[in-house]
């Protein structure tokens, strides 16, 4: 018998998550605890409910730049090794409880050195936290593998150094590199040296592109930088024309992305909050899925969007009428696009994802 498509059953479904920011997924209670422990005095609210509401409301700005301002508070309490370890471990526990079986969680080490930690200290603390979180999830009967993407801030000038850090820690759980931050005025081509370094090291990278800026950002990420995946990439829809009869006509760039099977790390709720799309109903996710782009479902920032992978999937089901087979396809898309070795990806697809959905499909 096919399981009902509700939040409870979707939570049971195995999921793969490619785009989730560590500093965007803290528990509100943890933010309060860490603020007290570290002496951070700038929080806009002092109880869990009010703080969670503030983050969601502040993130609902319709502007990527204003959305990013909310991170001052989470980053502000993540300046010690113990804080980073706790946040990383809780991240894994929360994802596992939501049915995520594989995740690539990204963070920018350069944002966590204000209190004296080195970049290596930051990496050590986060990776140890992930490992402890995996062990705690396993003890609770949840199977999850978490790896990390080491992120450089696109407005800064440390991307080559951060790329080297990603390669240095690639045998300890860092599976790739990323650049993030405001797109407008900070094109990915400012960081060509970092991307060339990653390619020469036979390492993988994704680029935030096509979220707060349009097709030029996507074009540069693919044509000049050689991105393996696109963080968001939602504005690729601007290169697709829909004729009077409903037929889609792809431009050169959108055709290239589809032909090359470039994974799109789509984050529906976040895209509405930042103004990339007006509403979930206006999100091009369904169009891109029907045109067989490699679409994936992601959370982006669970605290700011008050979301989980299960909630993101449910919102897509409610908006576009998807069934279990669609959710399985999006999950397999994500797992195929992960930055871990092929045999590990295949094992998770064959041994975890397909059997898990088979039970739900009936």
Swiss-Prot record:
UniProt-recorded Gene Ontology molecular function terms: 2'-deoxyadenosine deaminase activity; adenosine deaminase activity; zinc ion binding
Stored Pfam families: A_deaminase
UniProt site positions, description: Important for catalytic activity: 232
Catalytic residues (positions): 211
EC numbers: 3.5.4.4
UniProt binding sites for Zn(2+): 19, 21, 208, 300
Keyword Zinc: yes
One biological process term in Gene Ontology: hypoxanthine salvage
Binding site for substrate: 21, 23, 181
UniProt catalytic activity: adenosine + H2O + H(+) = inosine + NH4(+); 2'-deoxyadenosine + H2O + H(+) = 2'-deoxyinosine + NH4(+)
Cofactor requirements of the protein: Zn(2+)
InterPro entries, alphabetized: A_deaminase, A_deaminase_dom, Ado/ade_deaminase, Metal_Hydrolase
GO CC term (a single one): cytosol
Annotated cofactor note: Binds 1 zinc ion per subunit.
Keywords of the record: Hydrolase, Metal-binding, Nucleotide metabolism, Zinc
Residues in the signal sequence: none
Superkingdom as given in the UniProt entry: Bacteria
Family statement: Belongs to the metallo-dependent hydrolases superfamily. Adenosine and AMP deaminases family. Adenosine deaminase subfamily.
Role this protein plays: Catalyzes the hydrolytic deamination of adenosine and 2-deoxyadenosine.
UniProt cross-references to PANTHER family, sorted A to Z: ADENOSINE DEAMINASE (PTHR11409:SF43)
HAMAP family xref list: A_deaminase
UniProt protein name: Adenosine deaminase
Protein source organism: Mycobacteroides abscessus (strain ATCC 19977 / DSM 44196 / CCUG 20993 / CIP 104536 / JCM 13569 / NCTC 13031 / TMC 1543 / L948) (Mycobacterium abscessus)
């Amino acid at each position: 018998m096919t399981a009902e498509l509700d939040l409870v059953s979707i939570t049971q479904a195995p999921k793969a998550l490619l785009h989730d920011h560590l500093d965007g997924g803290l528990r509100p209670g943890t933010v309060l605890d860490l603020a007290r422990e570290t002496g951070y005095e700038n929080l806009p609210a002092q109880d869990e409910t009010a703080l969670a509401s503030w983050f969601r409301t502040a993130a609902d700005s319709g502007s990527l730049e204003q959305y990013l301002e909310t991170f001052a508070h989470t980053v502000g309490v993540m300046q010690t090794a113990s804080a980073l370890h706790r946040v990383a471990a809780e991240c894994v526990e929360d994802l596992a409880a939501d049915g995520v079986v594989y995740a690539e969680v990204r963070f920018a080490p350069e944002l966590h050195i204000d209190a004296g930690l080195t970049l290596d200290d930051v990496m050590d603390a986060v990776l140890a936290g992930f490992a402890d979180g995996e062990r705690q999830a396993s003890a609770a009967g949840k199977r999850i593998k978490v790896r990390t993407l080491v992120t450089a801030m696109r407005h800064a000038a440390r991307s080559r150094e951060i790329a080297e850090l990603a390669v240095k820690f690639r045998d300890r759980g860092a599976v790739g590199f990323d650049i993030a931050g405001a797109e407008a005025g900070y094109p990915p081509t400012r960081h060509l040296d970092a991307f060339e370094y990653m390619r020469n090291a036979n390492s993988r990278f994704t680029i935030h592109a096509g979220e707060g800026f349009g097709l030029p950002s996507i074009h540069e990420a693919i044509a000049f930088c050689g991105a393996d995946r696109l963080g968001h990439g939602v504005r690729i829809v601007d290169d697709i024309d829909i004729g009077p009869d409903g037929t889609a006509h792809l431009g050169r760039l959108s055709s290239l992305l589809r032909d090359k099977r470039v994974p799109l790390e789509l984050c529906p709720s976040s895209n509405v909050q930042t103004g990339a799309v007006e509403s979930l109903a206006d999100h091009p996710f369904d169009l891109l899925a029907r045109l067989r782009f490699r679409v994936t479902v992601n959370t982006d920032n669970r605290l700011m969007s008050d979301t989980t992978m299960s909630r993101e999937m449910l919102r897509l089901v409610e908006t576009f009428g998807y069934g279990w087979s669609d959710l399985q396809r999006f999950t397999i898309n994500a797992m195929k696009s992960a930055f871990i070795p092929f045999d590990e990806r295949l094992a998770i697809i064959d041994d975890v994802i397909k059997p898990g959905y088979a039970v739900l499909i009936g």
